[in-house]
């Protein structure tokens, strides 16, 4: 689950939480103090999504995408409705988006702090790694719980051990910031970043690529820049574009990745970089990158100049809209108001 928006949400909510009754959370004493880390992928701990709930979530995400292009306040109740019903069926992605809406005040809540913590605790109770990461954020910010950085770090580490890439990057970054003067933690931090990179964390992939350059492993650096570009990181695409460009004495230290000059490869990477940069607010990605600009010695295939994400973004085709009959069935089975997705009898605002 992507969490970049959640951090902004926490900052938005922190003031609102001041003065609220603090909740006690488990101290995770069972989280080992040792630094040793084994790479685990988050997907091993994520339950299969309910197909009908996922239909609701996908339609709500399409509405959200259109909000990014042109905000319409009338869309928010509809989004809340879909997210709430999907969340009731254990949809952990809808859970995150619902919390974000509550935090921004675009979804109704009788008690925003309590509901946000309840939703997060539900993920933890089901062993979903992102729940531990999010609770770590709340502990660090003191949002509805007693501010406790040490305990926050335990929650981050628990999330990292369960495979959450955001937690792996965060903990890994703390360890690599100790610098090479602390070789043990530094090495473990880089292993955490590598694990996050392999799971779709673009920034982790870029930074691990830089570490490979430091170790003079240019082939590995190029591979991780390629991976980061797939995940949507424009810096990685720029690095590869420059790497396939003309290397001079002036730019050698900055651009040389041990690659042979290739003008067409450079052109393609720079085009991709432009899209990733221009649309960064919408989180584009290029999973088909190896079909557009495979690394040498593979030959370049023909390319029409557009990544699939941009084609889909411009087409803006709506996923199937959930029927009212489906919404009513799903909502009533969970004791929710089919019209709002809120608990039956909840006070409306």
Identify what each model region corresponds to.
Residues 98-106, 171-177, 210, 238-249, ...:
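TPR/TPR-like alpha-solenoid helical repeat scaffolds
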Residues 222-234, 241-251, 255-279:
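TPR/TPR-like (Sel1-like) alpha-helical repeat modules
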């Amino acid at each position: 689950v992507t969490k970049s928006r959640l951090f902004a949400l926490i900052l938005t909510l922190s003031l609102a939480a001041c003065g609220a009754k603090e909740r006690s959370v488990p101290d995770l004493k069972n989280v080992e103090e040792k630094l040793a880390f084994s790479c685990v992928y988050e997907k091993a701990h994520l339950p299969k999504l309910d197909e009908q709930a996922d239909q609701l979530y996908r339609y709500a995400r399409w509405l959200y995408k259109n909000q990014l292009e042109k905000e319409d306040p009338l869309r928010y109740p509809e989004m809340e409705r879909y997210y709430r019903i999907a969340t009731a069926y254990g949809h952990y992605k809808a859970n995150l988006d619902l919390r974000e809406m509550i935090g921004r005040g675009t979804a109704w809540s009788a008690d925003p702090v309590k509901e946000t913590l309840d939703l997060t605790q539900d993920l933890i109770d089901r062993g979903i790694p992102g729940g531990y990461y999010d609770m770590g954020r709340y502990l660090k910010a003191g949002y509805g719980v007693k501010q406790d950085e040490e305990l926050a770090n335990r929650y981050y580490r628990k999330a990292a051990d369960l495979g959450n890439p955001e937690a792996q990057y965060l903990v890994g970054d703390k360890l690599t910031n100790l610098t090479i003067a602390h070789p043990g933690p530094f090495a473990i931090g880089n292993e955490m970043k590598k694990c996050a990179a392999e799971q779709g964390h673009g920034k982790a992939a870029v930074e691990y690529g830089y570490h490979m350059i430091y170790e003079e492993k240019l082939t590995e650096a190029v591979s991780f820049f390629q991976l980061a570009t797939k995940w949507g990181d424009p810096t990685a695409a720029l690095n590869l574009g420059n790497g396939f460009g003309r290397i001079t004495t002036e730019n050698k230290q900055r651009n040389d990745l041990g690659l042979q000059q290739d003008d067409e490869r450079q052109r393609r990477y720079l085009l991709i970089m432009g899209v990733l940069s221009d649309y960064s607010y919408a989180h584009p990605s290029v999973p088909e990158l190896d079909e557009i600009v495979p690394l040498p010695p593979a030959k370049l295939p023909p390319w029409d100049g557009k990544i699939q994400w941009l084609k889909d973004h411009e087409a803006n085709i709506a996923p199937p809209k959930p029927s009212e009959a489906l919404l009513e069935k799903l909502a009533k089975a969970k004791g929710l108001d089919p019209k709002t997705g809120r608990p039956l009898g909840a006070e409306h605002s």
